[in-house]
Amino acid sequence: MIKWPWKAQEITQNEDWPWDNALAIPLLVNLTAQEQARLIALAERFLQQKRLVALQGFELDSLKSARIALIFCLPILELGIEWLDGFHEVLIYPAPFVVDDEWEDDIGLVHSQRVVQSGQSWQQGPIILNWLDIQDSFDASGFNLIIHEVAHKLDMRNGDRASGIPFIPLRDVAGWEHDLHAAMNNIQDEIDLVGESAASIDAYAATDPAECFAVLSEYFFSAPELFAPRFPALWQRFCQFYRQDPSQRLRVSAAEGDYGEESEH
């Protein structure tokens, strides 16, 4: 159990969101105009349904809130807003935060430790984030704190705890589990060879299946070129679950860019 310091400032509702500016980040640049319009519609509903709460002196404004909402809704662009019904509040610290973490080990002993967290989510609880890492989530780099925590929430729709297997048809579970564990083993092999800091995929993905699903969801949306060719079978399973193909978006965007350059000559 984590004990949180509740010193909060809640954002007020604002109907005049700066969507054009909010969309102007590398993570969202490859969306089509139609996808952007649907993403904005979802983000507007998100801001109506969820409370964004600024903690420890952090200040939210309309642009920050709009970008947060857009990133929250990117994973559920084709799933629907109801996939985010497992929480009602988003708590935002200015930076990674220290909390008192208590847990019980296998023999029943309770341990307590102060730990630094970037984010946190759990069943039917709020999502906890920090602004420094949210800002780093705007890039197409493979790191995205918001998508990571959303993936945990989507994962937990399939049960009380995150397992790495989201809500998919029962016939697909065994194949998903096989491909996910194969990816974990592959990532661990690379870590053993070159070390955590030099690994091409965040080493956190090798810790357990739930974290592997969350980390690879970050890469799925923000660095598909690192995910798709390395784990093609698992990539296809992610495409089927999220009902999106960011790698295809990237190819189309690159082709359009090449065409535009040729037209200028």
From Swiss-Prot:
Identify the residues that bind Zn(2+). Answer: 111, 148, 152, 211
Alphabetically, the GO molecular function entries are:
aminopeptidase activity; metallopeptidase activity; zinc ion binding
| A Pfam family | Peptidase_M90
Q: Known EC number(s)?
A: 3.4.11.-
For this UniProt record, the keywords arranged alphabetically read as follows:
Aminopeptidase, Cytoplasm, Hydrolase, Metal-binding, Metalloprotease, Protease, Zinc
Q: Where in the cell is it found?
A: Cytoplasm
**Where is this protein primarily located?**
cytoplasm
Q: Which Gene3D superfamilies match?
A: Collagenase (Catalytic Domain), Glucose-regulated metallo-peptidase M90, N-terminal domain
Query: What broad class of enzyme is this?
Result: hydrolase
Cofactor: how and how many bound: Binds 1 zinc ion per subunit.
The reply to whether Zinc figures as a keyword in the UniProt entry is yes
Q: Which GO terms describe its biological process?
A: proteolysis
Q: Name one GO cellular component term.
A: cytosol
Q: So which cofactors does this thing need?
A: Zn(2+)
CDD domains, per the entry? Peptidase_M90_mtfA
Q: What superkingdom heads the lineage?
A: Bacteria
Q: Which family does it belong to?
A: Belongs to the MtfA family.
What does the function comment of this entry state? Involved in the modulation of the activity of the glucose-phosphotransferase system (glucose-PTS). Interacts with the transcriptional repressor Mlc, preventing its interaction with DNA and leading to the modulation of expression of genes regulated by Mlc, including ptsG, which encodes the PTS system glucose-specific EIICB component. Shows zinc-dependent metallopeptidase activity.
Assembly, in brief, is:
Interacts with Mlc.
Q: What is this protein called?
A: Mlc titration factor A
Its taxonomic path starts at:
Bacteria, Pseudomonadati, Pseudomonadota, Gammaproteobacteria, Enterobacterales
This protein's encoding gene: mtfA
